[in-house]
């Protein structure tokens, strides 16, 4: 846009086809030679690297615009094709038009009344802002039904499309063996008691003279169309064969040139902007050099872009075509060269068309042509526009650090010195800015660059840092290192929801990994088995302010998906709070102080009592209560099934475990967040994590093989339960083989047998689990983890200690394998438990080779299912994001798209954020408390609050209302 020119608002954008003349007009040069560079290494004129198409080499000037490399965006050229070729992108549309228009007069095969009706449909569709392609499809479908042109009366033939770019006109003609077909159909058929048809009878049925029938039967006369159809009807024979006439691109172009413009308008095509003959190319645009740059290899040779390779092929075949045609070569050679030219133009457009061999390098690698540059994950749209590589980002492995706040992230010092934030120098921060510059790029906190007021950027080095520091004045900008407290954005892929990218505060730390508090793992779906995460350093104050207010971790404690907390205590934290509060253990003063020393609590509450020795003690409930807000009152059923009672910030009853403080909807965290705010919730979660870690270290908590080993007596009871199940299964099999097994309603006998065997073996596993569970104490580490909800379940413990159980594929016992048996270790048609995937061993005792094989079969199904679901859900999510990305909630509360169409009159139909709604019927939000908290944060005095609430001040003098006021005051 030139200076002083006012910007204009775009009313609409319409797409159309380009006229060959437009290709020529925008072209900087005609390309006629396939050579690129001369012997001296300079681009050849009218070649594919002509300087008029743009320049990529430093020092050269573009001969079209005069700009140097970097300033010139490049210019198109063109190739004059020796013969028309079909644009493969329009092959389906070409087929539709060939089938819907007359082969003689090229008019649309619809009557004038039908055309008017479709024009009205188009106007109505456009006024409703709907897609007009459905109307066009309906018009072509209607036109295809006509076998005669309603305008010129010409007979119409079907058009067959042989992908990608070959078209045939299919005509039904009289078969060469028509007389034999008639004679064969007239013969008697003994199987169907058919006496056959004599020539005299055929003549009577068809009203054809008997002499003519005899001439037809002898092959002396070829019947006309009316006679042929009459004979076919009489004897039920087909006397025709398909005659396929290939339509050359030049024929199709001539056909389309004759289509009237008003007929195109009935199909929704603007004939001024898009003529159908332009889909058959006579001129091929050549992309600018900047779109297909060549590179220089280490040995000095140039390597050309894939598009340039393809254009070389097109020019060479084009030249051969012209030379052979001018030399009068046979038609067969001309058609072969034409097909070859069509192939090269097709693969230049798209090198992944099914049924067409891809163009390849000498190495065998397929060329990456125009379509491949645009589509797919690595293409222009998804790879370069929607997502791209950015500066000011870092990526490394993550490690856990429970000493950090959930708002913080540990950043390696090496990253902190490489990443910078822009600091605008003023009077207040001048000395600090100079100190950063003086420290240089190596010292931390230092600076890497400074920007002068005139916009010039100067790199800070060890040599010039002292001098630069003295020159820094207000108005300069310093690109300083990241320091503690800086706000950055942290992300883990795949980014499936909003909380996959959140803002953290920097804590610069040694070593090379990002450090993260474990309570922040659930929203990122992160673990520490090698996961990597991305960090982005924000570059301006607006971005940093928005991130701090909207994206900080403490603002994401409640999930917008289900309205409950997604951040909370996990795994070891839950085991720690369980040990601290289960059975309400007692602690002496030293132990109680040690438990609370990493929290903000600086003094112990009053002791709960004294023991037999007269020493004071504090309880687990009492210590946990120190973390709760003073006015918190709750009562609900907890993880372990007992009732949790909290009154005025004191835990009176219950055990604190997953449902109380864990992630994904715990009562205490959810309530504190909604009633007391995100800051108080963040403090609570941090302190619960610290207290839980101290508790788990106090009690001691470890797990090993011995913790899952059952006693000899328990092992014998488990073996008895499994043997009893085996005996029951054998009885079922014998009953089935004797034919005495009754089928269940709606089931076959085979299905009934399988169901009963599965039920029997399922009960055996449950019995083994019950025995194993009885064998373990309540303080067993695996039992603690299962009961508290920290990790795993009693089923996992059952399989570790008792019996793994039946392995299933697609919900059934394992039946696949060899013929009539699952493995070669079993007899054919063996229906026993062992032969169909029952694993009687536990993980502790170890699986036999046969059991291991069956177990792997069951596990594979889970892996495959996970992979399939991941790819499907990822594709669906991307489709939804693309479809919904333009929707936006406006200031009037409506949800609208970019064309201002109202999608919802109120966001979510109720105008309510899930974060603000209580999802638990048992726990109501204390609305008054929330209102008081908001008012206290907004107003400094009670007078301001009263003005806001429009509460009238009580009278201050004892007038007529004085007595009434005194009474009210006494109350």
Curated annotation (Swiss-Prot):
Its cofactor is Mg(2+); Zn(2+). GO terms for biological process: DNA-templated transcription. It is found in: Cytoplasm. SMART domains: RPOLA_N (SM00663). It catalyses: RNA(n) + a ribonucleoside 5'-triphosphate = RNA(n+1) + diphosphate. The N-terminus is blocked. Its EC number is 2.7.7.6. GO terms for cellular component: cytoplasm; DNA-directed RNA polymerase complex. Zn(2+) 2 binds at residues 102, 105, 149, 152. Keywords: Cytoplasm, DNA-binding, DNA-directed RNA polymerase, Magnesium, Metal-binding, Nucleotidyltransferase, Transcription, Transferase, Zinc. It is an enzyme of class 2 (transferase). GO terms for molecular function: DNA binding; DNA-directed RNA polymerase activity; magnesium ion binding; zinc ion binding. Signal peptide: none annotated. Binds at least 2 Zn(2+) per subunit. Pfam families: RNA_pol_Rpb1_1 (PF04997), RNA_pol_Rpb1_2 (PF00623), RNA_pol_Rpb1_3 (PF04983), RNA_pol_Rpb1_4 (PF05000), RNA_pol_Rpb1_5 (PF04998). The keyword Nucleotidyltransferase applies. Belongs to the RNA polymerase beta' chain family. NCBIfam families: PRK08566.1, RNA_pol_rpoA1. Part of the RNA polymerase complex. This is DNA-directed RNA polymerase subunit Rpo1N. It comes from Halobacterium salinarum (strain ATCC 29341 / DSM 671 / R1).
């Amino acid at each position: 846009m030139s200076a002083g020119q006012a910007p204009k608002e775009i009313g609409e954008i319409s797409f159309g086809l380009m006229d060959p003349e437009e290709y020529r007009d925008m072209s900087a040069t005609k390309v006629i030679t396939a050579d690129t560079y001369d012997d001296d290494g300079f681009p050849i004129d009218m070649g594919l690297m002509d300087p008029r198409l743009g320049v990529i080499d430093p020092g050269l000037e573009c001969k079209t615009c005069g700009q140097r490399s970097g300033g010139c965006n490049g210019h198109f050229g063109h190739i004059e094709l020796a013969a028309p070729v079909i644009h493969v992108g329009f092959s389906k549309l070409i087929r539709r038009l060939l089938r819907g228009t007359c082969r003689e007069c090229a008019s649309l095969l619809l009557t004038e009344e039908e055309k008017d009706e479709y024009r009205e449909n188009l106007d109505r569709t456009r006024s409703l802002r709907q897609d007009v392609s459905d109307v066009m499809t309906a018009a072509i479908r209607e036109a295809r039904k006509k076998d005669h042109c309603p305008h010129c009366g010409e007979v119409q033939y079907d058009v067959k499309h042989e992908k990608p770019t070959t078209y045939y006109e299919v005509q039904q003609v009289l078969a060469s063996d028509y007389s034999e077909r008639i004679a064969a159909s007239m013969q008697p058929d003994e199987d169907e008691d058919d006496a056959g048809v004599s020539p005299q009878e055929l003549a009577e049925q068809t009203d054809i003279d008997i002499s003519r029938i005899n001439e037809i039967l002898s092959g002396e006369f070829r019947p006309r169309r009316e006679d042929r159809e009459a004979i076919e009807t009489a004897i039920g024979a087909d006397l025709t064969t398909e005659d396929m006439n290939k339509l050359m691109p030049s024929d199709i172009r001539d056909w389309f040139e004759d289509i009237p413009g008003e007929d195109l308008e009935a199909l929704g095509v603007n004939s001024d902007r898009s003529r159908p003959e332009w889909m058959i190319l006579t001129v091929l645009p050549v992309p600018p050099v900047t779109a297909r740059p060549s590179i220089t290899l280490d040995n000095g040779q140039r390597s050309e872009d894939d598009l340039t390779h393809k254009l070389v092929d097109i020019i060479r075949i084009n030249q051969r075509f012209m030379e052979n045609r001018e030399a009068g070569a046979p038609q067969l050679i001309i058609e072969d060269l034409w097909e070859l030219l069509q192939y090269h133009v097709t693969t230049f457009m798209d090198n992944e068309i099914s049924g067409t061999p891809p163009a390849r390098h000498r190495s065998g690698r397929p060329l990456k042509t125009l379509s491949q540059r645009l589509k797919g994950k690595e293409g222009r749209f998804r790879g370069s526009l929607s997502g791209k590589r950015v500066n000011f980002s870092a990526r490394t492995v993550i490690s856990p650090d429970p000493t950090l706040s959930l708002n913080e992230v540990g950043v390696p010092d090496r990253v902190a010195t490489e990443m910078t934030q822009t600091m605008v120098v003023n009077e207040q921060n001048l000395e600090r800015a100079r100190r950063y510059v003086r420290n240089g790029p190596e010292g931390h906190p230092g600076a890497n660059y400074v920007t002068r007021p005139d916009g010039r950027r100067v790199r800070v080095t060890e040599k010039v840092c002292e001098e630069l520091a003295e020159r820094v004045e207000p108005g300069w900008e310093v690109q300083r290192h990241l320091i503690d407290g800086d706000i950055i954005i942290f992300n883990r892929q795949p980014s499936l929801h909003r909380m996959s990218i959140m803002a953290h505060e920097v804590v610069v730390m040694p070593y090379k990994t990002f450090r993260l508090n474990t309570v922040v793992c659930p929203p990122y779906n992160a673990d520490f088995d090698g996961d990597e995460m991305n960090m982005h350093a924000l570059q301006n104050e607006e971005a940093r302010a928005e991130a701090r207010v909207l994206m900080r971790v403490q603002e994401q404690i409640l999930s917008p998906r289900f309205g409950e907390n997604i951040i909370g205590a996990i795994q070891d934290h839950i085991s720690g709070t369980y040990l601290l509060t289960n059975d309400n253990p007692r602690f002496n003063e030293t132990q109680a102080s040690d438990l609370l020393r990493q929290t903000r609590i600086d003094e112990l509450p009053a002791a709960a009592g004294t023991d037999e020795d007269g020493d004071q003690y504090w309880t687990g409930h009492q210590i946990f209560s120190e973390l709760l807000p003073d006015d918190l009152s709750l009562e609900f059923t907890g993880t372990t099934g007992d009732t949790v009672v909290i009154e005025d910030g004191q835990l009176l009853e219950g055990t604190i475990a997953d449902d109380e403080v864990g992630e994904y909807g715990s009562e205490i965290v959810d309530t504190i967040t909604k009633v007391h705010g995100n800051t108080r919730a963040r403090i609570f979660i941090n302190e619960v994590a610290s207290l839980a870690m101290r508790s788990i270290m106090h009690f001691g908590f470890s797990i090993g093989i011995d913790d899952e080993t059952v006693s000899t007596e328990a092992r014998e009871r488990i073996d008895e339960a499994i043997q009893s199940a085996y005996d029951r299964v054998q009885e079922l099999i014998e009953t089935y083989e004797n034919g005495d097994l009754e089928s269940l309603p709606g089931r076959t006998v085979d299905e009934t047998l399988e169901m009963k065997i599965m039920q029997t073996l399922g009960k055996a596993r449950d019995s083994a689990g019950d025995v194993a569970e009885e064998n373990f104490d309540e303080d067993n580490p695996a039992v603690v983890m299962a009961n508290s909800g920290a990790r795993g379940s009693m089923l996992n413990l059952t399989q570790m200690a008792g019996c793994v159980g039946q392995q299933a594929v697609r919900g059934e016992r394992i039946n696949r394998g060899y013929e009539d048996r699952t493995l070669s270790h079993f007899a054919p048609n063996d229906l026993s438990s062992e032969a169909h995937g029952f694993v009687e061993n536990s993980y502790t005792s170890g699986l036999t080779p046969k059991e291991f094989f069956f177990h792997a079969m069951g596990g594979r199904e889970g892996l495959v299912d996970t992979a399939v679901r991941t790819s499907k859900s990822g594709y669906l999510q991307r489709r939804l994001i693309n479809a919904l990305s333009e929707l936006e909630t406006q200031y009037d509360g409506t949800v609208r798209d970019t064309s201002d169409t109202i999608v919802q009159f109120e966001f979510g139909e109720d105008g309510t954020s899930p974060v603000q709604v209580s999802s638990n019927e048992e726990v109501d939000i204390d609305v008054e408390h929330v209102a008081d908290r908001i008012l206290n944060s907004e107003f400094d005095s009670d007078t301001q609050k009263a003005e806001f609430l429009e509460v009238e001040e009580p009278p201050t003098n004892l007038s007529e209302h004085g007595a009434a006021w005194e009474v009210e005051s006494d109350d």
